[in-house]
Amino acid sequence: MKCKKQLLVIFFAYFLVVNESEAIFGSLFSLGSKLLPSVFKLFSRKKQRALMKRDLEDIMDPYQKNLKLDRYLRRLAMD
């Protein structure tokens, strides 16, 4: 009889521990599945911003030659 009670207590303790761990890991997984995509989007946005900033710097560079304008001026000079 004593052995049956011990086994019953062990079974219930194991059942509670497994249920709690399943709930904890389930909540961690759901949080992770929500957070990971947002983290990846954040890093990709930073890369896009850096590329856009570089493009703007290239456009605003006063020493950059405008090749189309040079071609038009050469045509005008030849005519």
UniProtKB/Swiss-Prot annotation:
GO terms for molecular function: toxin activity. Disulfide bonds: none annotated. Residues 1-23 form the signal peptide. Residues 49-79 form a propeptide. GO terms for biological process: defense response to bacterium; defense response to fungus; killing of cells of another organism. Expressed by the venom gland. The keyword Membrane applies. It comes from the Eukaryota. Keywords: Antibiotic, Antimicrobial, Cytolysis, Fungicide, Hemolysis, Membrane, Secreted, Signal, Target cell membrane, Target membrane, Toxin. It is found in: Secreted; Target cell membrane. The keyword Cytoplasm does not apply. One of its GO terms (cellular component) is extracellular region. Antimicrobial peptide with potent activity against a range of Gram-positive and Gram-negative bacteria. Has high hemolytic activity against erythrocytes. May act by disrupting the integrity of the bacterial cell membrane. Belongs to the non-disulfide-bridged peptide (NDBP) superfamily. Medium-length antimicrobial peptide (group 3) family. Ponericin-W subfamily. This is Ponericin-W-like 32.1. It comes from Lychas mucronatus.
